[in-house]
Structure formats: C-alpha cells, structure tokens
Amino acid sequence: MTSQPQSRPSRLHPNIWFLTIGSLLTDVSSEMLTNLIPLFLYNVLGVQTSIIGLIDGIAETTASLVKIYSGALSDRLGKRKMLTVAGYALSTISKPFLYMAVTWEWVLGVRFSDRVGKGIRTAPRDALLAGSAKTDQRGFAFGIHRAGDTAGAFFGLGIAGLIIWLTQAGVTVLERHTFQVVVLASIIPAVLAVLVLALGVKEVDAERQSNHNLPTLRWKTFDRRFRAFVIVVIIFTLGNSSDSFIILRGQNRGLSVLQIIGMLMTFNAVYALLAGPLGSLSDRIGRRKLMLAGWTIYGLVYLGFALSHTGAEIWMLFGFYGIYYALTEGVAKALVADIVPQEQRGTAYGLFNAAIGFSALPASVIAGVLWQYINPAAPFIFGAVLSLLAGFLLVTWVR
C-alpha cells in the first residue's frame, strides 16, 4: 500500500488532537519545573548526587505501581477517559507545593504525588490513543502525540528561561526566588490542560472484560514477543538514568542555568521536529529498525557525555540525544500495540511503563553513586554499555 503521510493529519480521530493539545499544555507546565529541580536541589538545597538519583528513582518507581493497576482497571471498565483526566488533575494539584519546598524530603513528596498522577493517566491514555488510531496510522499518531508533548516542553523551557533572565540576570546558578516564580507560572497551563482533556476527549469503545475473563498481571498472559521486548527494555533502562545527571554534567562542564535551558530547548526542538515523521516511518519499515537505531545513537551520545571536556560539547550531544528520543519513544509504544490484542492494551501499557519505572530506581541510584564515588563520567559509560547490549538483544530476541 502506498503511504501518503502528508494526508494523514486530516484523517486522524479528534481524540488524538485533543490528547496532543493536553499533553502539550501539561509539558509547558512540567518542563518549566522538572529540569530545574536537580539544579534547585544541587545549587539551592545543597543535596548530593546520590540523593538526587534516589529522589528521581523513588518517584518513578512508586508511580509504576499505579501504572500497572490503572492500566488493568481501564481494561476492566472498558473506559479510559476518566482515569486519564484524573491523573492529569492530580499532577496539577501537586505543583504549587514546590513553592514551599525547603528540604529534599519535601521535594520528594511533591515528585511522588506528581508521578502518581502520571502513573494514573499514562496507560489508559496510551490505550485511548491507540484505540483512536487506525492500525496503519498508529506509529504516526503516537509520533504526533509525542511531538506535541515535546513542543510543549520547548515552550515551557522558553518561558522558564525568560523568567530566569528577568529575575536573576547574569547569575549563573539557580536561585530560590527564581524557582518560586517559575512554580507559580507553571500552574496556568496545567489547569488549561485538564480542561481541554475533560471537555474535548471522547471515550472510544473498547471491549469490556467480563468478570470471569478479567485481565491479569500474570507474566504468562502475554505473547512471548511482548515479554521479550519488556525484558530488553528493562536492560536498556537500567543504564538510562534520570536526565538530571545530564543537566548536572552540563553545569559540571561550565554551562550556566540559562545555557542549560538553551541546551534543553535544542533537545526538544530536535525531538518535536522528528517524532512525527519517524513515527510515520516506523509504520512503513518496522518498529525494531528504528528502536535499534535509536539505542545505538543513545550509546554513542552517552559515551560522548563521558568523554566531553566543554559545555559546548554537552550542548551539541544533547541535540543528538533528541534524535534518540524521536526514534524510540512513540515507536516503542506503537510496537506494544502491534503485538498485544486491543482488550489487553491497557494492562500491557501498564506493565510496559511499570517495567521502565521500576528499572528507573536502580538506574538513577547507580548513576548517583557512580557520579559521587567514582567520577561524573562513570554513569554515562555504564549507560552506553547497557544500551549496546540491549540493542543486540532486541535484534536476537524480539522477532
């Protein structure tokens, strides 16, 4: 069948556009804060890297428990929208509490609440997105959604950068007052996102599981290819620590807080421009090829982070890091939809996202310890090795 990607946007289900707009607004809010949190912890509160890794790991791993059961619950109810909106709302409610943060434990509590909200919404949202797209549009739909997500991150970073420039001018490290102003500004797009999703998204019919045929969390329930893919993703994720360490590496190599914002905007611009086209490409040439290319680029970029000597090198490498994200993020979710029946997708996405989240705790803790007790290059070498191993297993196991 001849592919005509230029005509696809006009034929996409309206849900895909509303979910994309909601994610865009959410990321405007979230990215104003998320990438400043490690700098707030390190520069303002004086927290060590091992604790920063622990905070990121605990937040993601705790949310993983919610991801499993929210996905299973959405399968049992045959309804996705309610859980999706509830998750976005909880994350919105948690954000203002960062304004009062004075200890790392306080930050952990807010991060925990925010990630629980993400855990509630992610699996049913992905199932809703998959159910709203035709099979031959699925990669494109996920790519468009991720592109909107990342475009929101780009604008959010731009707003954060403007606030930093206006409030602390030439000061190179983040200050408390600046962070508090960013927190207040982030609330507006978060509230708008919840309204867009609540009013715009419509439920998509899905087969409701009967009481004697409820989706289970047992491993053997799923196809061998899905199980193999999850195992390979876990191996990769163990070396894919929080991006907080890349941000700190940039500062370690001389980038100011405004330059770090610029670096992050470069990453998001690259990702936003490529996510849609590469998602569409995966519909034609296959998901595994793009995943392998993405993980290979990741390994080379992480090796570059380890060997870099200047902030400019970190900035350039972070642009290539955006290519890795565009090649893998939406494509991985489309691959899950390809190999799992529709009535199990909520549960499958819950397990898939949970596997990543559970791996995030040891990944970030290991990275923090390697940074603190060996050297700042060590976590990146570790990540590069595991990414290349995962790429090999993707080719040999997931067939």
Predicted feature residues:
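Juxtamembrane intracellular "pre-TM" segments in multi-pass secondary transporters
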Residues: 2-13, 202-232
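Helix-loop boundary and gating motifs at the non-cytosolic
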Residues: 6-64, 226-263
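Transmembrane alpha-helix termini and helix-breaking/packing motifs in multi-pass membrane transporters
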Residues: 39-44, 155-177, 362-378
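Central cavity-lining transmembrane alpha-helices of secondary-active solute carriers
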Residues: 54-72, 265-278
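Conserved MFS/SLC helix-loop-helix module at the cytosolic interface between two early adjacent transmembrane helices
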Residues: 65-102, 282-288
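Structural signature of the two symmetry-related core transmembrane helices
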Residues: 82-96, 187, 289-304, 384
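Cytoplasmic helix-loop-helix junction between adjacent transmembrane helices
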Residues: 110-151, 335
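C-terminal membrane-cytosol helix-exit motif in multi-pass small-molecule transporters
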Residues: 165, 187-207, 390-398
